[in-house]
Amino acid sequence: MESIKKVMVFGSGPIVIGQAAEFDFSGSQACKALKEEGIYTILVNSNPATIQTDTDMADKVYLEPLHPTIVEKIIEKERPDAILPTMGGQTGLNLALELHRRGILDKYGIKLLGSNIRTIEIAEDRELFAEAMAEINEPVTKCKAVNSVDEAVEFAEEIGYPVIVRPAFTLGGTGGGIAHNKEELIDITSKGLKYSIINQVLIDESVLGWKEFELEVMRDRKDTCIIVCGMENIDPMGIHTGESIVVSPIQTLPDEFYQKLRNAAIKIIRHLGIEGGCNIQFAVNKEMTEYRVIEVNPRVSRSSALASKATGYPIARIAAKIAIGKTLDEILNDVTKETPASFEPTLDYVVVKIPRWPFDKFKTVDKKLGTSMKSTGEVMAIGRSFEEALQKAIRSLDIGRFGIIGDGKDKDYTDEEIEEILKNPTDERIFVIAKALEKGWSVEKIVELTDIDEFFIKKIKNIVDMKKELEKLKEEIKKLNA
């Protein structure tokens, strides 16, 4: 990689739901990492309200639209040796694909770093993805890419309802949803086709209610692979990972099954030839006997930012250095200053991420959570136990709550309201679970209604039980002082 002296980095453009400050964080790290290695860095981003567009972040900053015609003019002027698109989220990958399709990369002899064109296409084209996974015997859901409503209806009737509708080349589940019948499918597919840049939606077999896990994987040019972080979505499949409460390290997966997912993740990143960071999502059935590979993001993702902050392992920085030819054993860990980046981080604490929804500002928006993102931010908290981290995260949300219960701001839900929210989750579900437990609902009933693992419901029950215990002690102290 000695021939690479000048690299162009794509930002992610305007802040939208599903693509926000996480990519500014990643892009800033990448620019600093490239400059550390003496690489002349050119940043292209249309959003001036970012850290990465500060003048000291890159050698040259272009505040221009992330459009192939504009970017070609910048390429013609700057003549970069390579482009790093994997720090710009879905926008960066889509732009790299379009530059390739227009022949601009070949015309100027530009190398693509991090992920190659075939890998990007496999990750985004569901049929290519299914074929790639079949080549290495990794299970995926039954799916089909369709370009019309009629095709969608035909395939849904073949595999049975419900089905998941996912527009191709979009972020945050935009335009997608869960169709339980033909009418819903027609409605969601019609909208989804408009959102997709290639007018294509993916009809997926439903794995609603299965557990969802994510692994952040790193690989270098010498084929060294490590798992940086394992994350568990508390909410089941059917709720977008950006809408779910997430905990790290993984809490409910037996080690034997975790090793299965770990081996699968390493097999996938090797097969796709990704050099740098990669996020892989798995669905696991409740009995923990089967899994499906749901998605591969061949780029730094929203989850990568969480994994970086949870572990202290700077994924974007190291991915940028790998992209220009460094190997994991050549890069020092920023935290220890001694061990190489090829050592997998281990956590002796619990990290909880909770999304922040803007429903206080948009009062007429449907609050139900599903496969499309509605949250506009998130908080992360660290504790020695799940209970501690959860309570800290709730307090950090800036919604006026000091915990899930017992702060004097609990709503008084009826049993009917509780059952409805447990079945059809909204942003209030975590508080409703606590209220149900306080009212004497059994753990088993809540598990049945929510599909959330019993482990997490019992952890929330510990908080509720502590509240009751403290109330008893308060009464006893009053008697003693009387």
Curated annotation (Swiss-Prot):
Record-linked InterPro entries: ATP-grasp, CarbamoylP_synth_lsu_oligo, CarbamoylP_synth_lsu_oligo_sf, CbamoylP_synth_lsu-like_ATP-bd, CbamoylP_synth_lsu_CPSase_dom, PreATP-grasp_dom_sf
Reactions mediated catalytically: hydrogencarbonate + L-glutamine + 2 ATP + H2O = carbamoyl phosphate + L-glutamate + 2 ADP + phosphate + 2 H(+); hydrogencarbonate + NH4(+) + 2 ATP = carbamoyl phosphate + 2 ADP + phosphate + 2 H(+)
Cofactor: Mg(2+); Mn(2+)
Swiss-Prot/TrEMBL keywords: Amino-acid biosynthesis, Arginine biosynthesis, ATP-binding, Ligase, Magnesium, Manganese, Metal-binding, Nucleotide-binding, Pyrimidine biosynthesis, Repeat
GO biological process, one term: 'de novo' UMP biosynthetic process
Disulfide bonds: none
Residue stretches making up the ATP-grasp domain: 130-324
Pfam entry (one): CPSase_L_D2
Cofactor: how and how many bound: Binds 2 Mg(2+) or Mn(2+) ions per subunit.
Positions that bind Mg(2+) 1: 281, 295
Record region (Carboxyphosphate synthetic domain): 1-398
Record's subunit section: Composed of two chains; the small (or glutamine) chain promotes the hydrolysis of glutamine to ammonia, which is used by the large (or ammonia) chain to synthesize carbamoyl phosphate. Tetramer of heterodimers (alpha,beta)4.
Domain notes: Corresponds to the N-terminal section. The large subunit is composed of 2 ATP-grasp domains that are involved in binding the 2 ATP molecules needed for carbamoyl phosphate synthesis. The N-terminal ATP-grasp domain (referred to as the carboxyphosphate synthetic component) catalyzes the ATP-dependent phosphorylation of hydrogencarbonate to carboxyphosphate and the subsequent nucleophilic attack by ammonia to form a carbamate intermediate.
Protein family membership: Belongs to the CarB family.
Name of protein: Carbamoyl phosphate synthase large chain, N-terminal section
Lineage of the organism: Archaea, Methanobacteriati, Methanobacteriota, Methanomada group, Methanococci
